[in-house]
Regions:
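Bacterial N-terminal signal peptides
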Residues: 10-16
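Gram-negative and organellar
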Residues: 22-298
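Bacterial N-terminal signal peptides that target proteins for export
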Residues: 1-8
Length: 298
């Protein structure tokens, strides 16, 4: 299976409406809100659109991607709150069946209750797609005629205890993810699932920009439709030890390694024990946008 995408052109612009007061670059003040519009586009050549196997015929196509976004940001008692919407339209010039239109909605807030107590929360909704030959159709891209579509949600929150000047910081976290495929075939219904995760992270500063961390999480995966089949529900425990460091004011790196145990509810599936690790970087170029790049043992 082979696929290569060559990006030829990429463009990003910030838009503004003259009738509204431009408070600063990229922001438009509208009452109590700062509106932050943006637009990105790219052109790429894809030489295996459906991830066809080596002995199957392949589809070659140029692809244009257009993605407008609008973020509305404000403050509540000095705490930042924002809501955003992004649309992504992908057009394949030689394969109309693979065209897609995805929608993304997000709301988030960071609240400092006092010098030692902070809370943040985020909610996300995605009406998205999986390219043919990826996700559920991995290795079977030519067996289906259009990309698989799904709806997913994410709700998460963190509570942090510790002053900014203290050496120690305790973070309690919880989140919930759901995934529901649009298709009604049984093969898709049995993959609709909910993932609930709770955890705690203890950090202790060991340098001016370096912190040692102990990260413990428990994840519960539950599938919605399992009538007549063996259950695939599972519980997973992860214990990781590592460090985080601040490379710049806008960039934070992290590296963790440890132990993972995955216990399946089905009696015919044995419990998995093994090592686990996670490495990545978080980049926050502006206050309303954070990018996370990471890789792990999964």
């Amino acid at each position: 299976m082979f696929k290569r995408t060559k990006s030829i052109i990429a463009m990003s612009v910030i838009c503004a409406t003259p009738k509204l007061y431009a408070q600063e670059a990229g922001r438009i003040q509208a009452g109590q809100f700062d509106l932050i519009p943006s637009f990105t586009s790219s052109m790429a050549y894809v030489d295996n659109v459906a991830y066809a196997r080596d002995d199957d015929p392949k589809i070659y196509s140029w692809r244009a991607t257009l993605s407008p976004e609008l973020i509305a940001a404000t403050e509540v008692d000095g705490n930042p709150v924002q809501v955003g919407y992004r649309l992504e339209r992908g057009v394949y010039f030689s394969s109309d069946n693979d065209d897609y239109t995805d929608h993304f909605v997000e709301a988030s807030g960071d609240f400092e209750l006092n010098s030692r107590h902070r809370v943040n929360a985020v909610a996300q909704y995605e009406d998205g797609h999986e390219e043919r030959g990826t996700g559920f159709s991995l290795g079977l891209g030519t067996a289906i005629t259009t990309p698989d579509r799904y709806k997913s949600t994410y709700f998460g929150g963190e509570y942090m205890y510790g002053a900014a000047t203290s050496d120690g910081l305790l973070t309690l976290k919880a989140n919930r993810e759901t995934l529901d495929y649009d298709r009604s075939e049984q093969a898709y219904l049995i993959r609709d699932r909910v993932k609930n995760k709770v955890g705690a992270e203890l950090g202790y500063r060991i340098g001016s920009a370096t912190t040692a961390v102990l990260d413990v999480t428990q994840t519960y995966v539950r599938y919605d439709n399992q009538t007549g089949i063996e259950t695939r529900d599972s519980d997973e425990t992860r214990v990781l030890l590592g460090v985080t460091w601040e490379s710049t004011a806008a960039t934070t790196g992290f590296a963790k390694v440890g132990y993972k145990e995955k216990d399946f509810e089905s009696a015919t599936r044995s419990t998995f024990y093994g090592t686990d690790w996670e490495v990545g970087v978080e980049w926050q170029p502006v206050s309303y946008s954070t990018f996370r790049f990471s890789t792990n043992a999964d």
